[in-house]
C-alpha cells in the first residue's frame, strides 16, 4: 500500500493523464469532494462521472509544489490548469485530502475566486496574444 502522499499524487497525475481507471481506484466509495464555495459531491461514482464527462471537452494539468502529511491527512500546494479548447486558466490551489486504507475519502480544495477571475482574463487575452498564455 502506498503512503498517503503517493496516493494523492498518483490520483492527481492520473486525472492529468485522463487515466480514469487509475484515478477511480485511488478514491474510496464514500468520497467527499468539495471545492470550497461550490456544491459538495458525495461518492466516488458521482465524482468520476464528472471527470469522465469532461474528457475531450476540457483538460486538467497539475504542478504540485509541496505536500505534507500527518497520519491520514495530506496537504498540498499546487497550480492547477483547466483548459477548454484554446482557453487556458491557471491558478493556485491548496488541497486537503484524507487517505484511509489506501484510498482518498476526502478531497477539499481551497482557492481564491479573484485568482480564478484573473486567470480567466489572462486566458482570454492569451487566446489573442499567445505570449500572454500562462505556462506551468
Predicted regions and their residues:
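Short, contiguous strand/loop micro-motifs
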Residues: 6-7, 38, 97
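Short acidic-aromatic low-complexity motifs
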Residues: 5-26
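Short helix-capping and inter-helix turn/linker motifs at the boundaries of alpha-helical repeat units
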Residues: 1-2
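A solvent-exposed, acidic/Ser-Thr-rich amphipathic alpha-helical stretch
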Residues: 21-22, 28-72
Amino acid at each position: 500500500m502506498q503512503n498517503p502522499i503517493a496516493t494523492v499524487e498518483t490520483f492527481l497525475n492520473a486525472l492529468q493523464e485522463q487515466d480514469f481507471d487509475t484515478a477511480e481506484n485511488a478514491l474510496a466509495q464514500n468520497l467527499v469532494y468539495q471545492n470550497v464555495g461550490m456544491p459538495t459531491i458525495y461518492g466516488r461514482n458521482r465524482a468520476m462521472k464528472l471527470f469522465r464527462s469532461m474528457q475531450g471537452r476540457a483538460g486538467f494539468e497539475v504542478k504540485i509544489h509541496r505536500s505534507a502529511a500527518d497520519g491520514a491527512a495530506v496537504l498540498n500546494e499546487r497550480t492547477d490548469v483547466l483548459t477548454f479548447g484554446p482557453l487556458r486558466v491557471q491558478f493556485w490551489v491548496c488541497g486537503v485530502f484524507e487517505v484511509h486504507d489506501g484510498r482518498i475519502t476526502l478531497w477539499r480544495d481551497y482557492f481564491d475566486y479573484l485568482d480564478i477571475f484573473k486567470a480567466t482574463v489572462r486566458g482570454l487575452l492569451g487566446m489573442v496574444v499567445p505570449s500572454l498564455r500562462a505556462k506551468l
